[in-house]
Amino acid sequence: MTYLLAIDQGTTSSRAMLFREDLSVAAQAQQEVPQHFPASGWVEHDPEDIWATTLATCRAAMEKGGVTAREIAAIGISNQRETTVVWERASGKAIHRAIVWQDRRTADVCARLQADGHEPLIATRTGLIADPYFSGTKIAWILDAVPGARARAERGELLFGTVDCYLLWRLTGGAVHATDATNASRTLLFDIYAGAWDDDLLRLLRVPRAMLPRVRDCAAEFGTTLPDLLGGPIAVRGIAGDQQAATVGQACFAPGMMKSTYGTGCFALLNTGATAVASKNKLLTTIAYQLNGVRTYALEGSIFVAGSAVQWLRDGLHLIKTAHDSDDLAPLADATQAVYLVPAFVGLGAPYWNPRVRGALFGLTRNTGPAEFAQAALESVCYQTHDLWTAMRADWPDGVTQNAALRVDGGMAVSDWTMQRLADILNVTVDRPVIPETTALGAAYLAGLASGICPPPAEFAARWQLDRRFTPEMDEETRARKLTGWTRAVKGLLASED
């Protein structure tokens, strides 16, 4: 039997999943990745931790599955996007910790870009906005913060990569410095229409071109692993950023299809086909995937805090012991209390894009307790998704129909209570697939597609299987009241910054 090995390197953990030819799961392994918070709004990873946990989970998954390198047709990589690594070309050693996508240290730089009128250039080339979320300003920060780094980068001694690129470099022993179009599209440096690095943006953000990787299709020949890493050489044939990999794994190949992934954050992507829809509602225009040199575009809404709100209940407030406890508590909340959590722990993402505002709770009373906190945390994810859904329908009214279903995945998607509340708040059908690990599935499929062992997209889409469908049950009056309360809470928080 032939297998596919998927690497799913995320914000809080590294996971490896072994898939059979029919894309059923044979084995998996997962390890937590330590996070570092050196200052308020700063989030970092040690690149060595990323590498060590990735390699360890690949080996563990292969051992659990009883599979050797000879039986694996290809590796597919999905990764936390935007997270930035700069390393030495000669040694492979990172010159600074990886700056994570959640990190907000370059907020002032982005504010200056906006004030100086550069946002139209950024938007028309990249589909993005000037925000610390993206890689470009993170690269510039590292080059300025590490003594001598800028001069070394200009001499070609330093390389930049998102996590996929860094892992590919390590897997191939430094033989390949490459990424895919989806990851490139998240750097603030890539023209998503021309499909190339943009010299104007490189000059604007002061990033030397010599640092940048080559950009390839999502399903392509990326290189071969060193034989001693996994017991033999294995071809790497698929790469996509985690949210784009999930879009593929959810088989959202038709324009108008939408998926939303609920992990540390929440990321909703709407397939717009060959049309790159320019948002008028502060969404992002991005590359959904690129196959055979053809780009498919998407509208994306990025929410920085979803599952991490539940982590806050557990690790910050110590109200729960496990994430599942929030599911048990939320239904017990007092229905007469209107408690809202606006989880702007690292600012607000789409459609507000405010990196400076911080989180707040509204509607607390003397009777507010753990159940109300749990419900507010879970509902905050639903309300934020509603903000994205509303913006997407406004941006592309002809492409999104009211009866369109939302496909969901990620760790929070296993919560029946949250998914039912999501259907209620959005007033749309929410579909959860049989295989919840759609990010890894998408990476495996891309690798299999390039290997010739997976079917074309249309046939793969026909195999998508539904686990459970959640249909709206909330009455319109209750829904409207809840959404009005959320809108007031967000407006109150934004007003408090002024």
UniProtKB/Swiss-Prot annotation:
Binding site residues for glycerol: 81-82, 133, 242-243
Catalytic activity, as annotated: glycerol + ATP = sn-glycerol 3-phosphate + ADP + H(+)
Residues that coordinate or bind ADP: 11, 15, 264, 307, 411
EC class of the enzyme, as a word: transferase
Name under which the protein is recorded: Glycerol kinase
Annotated binding of ATP, by residue: 11-13, 264, 307, 311, 411
Source species, domain of life: Bacteria
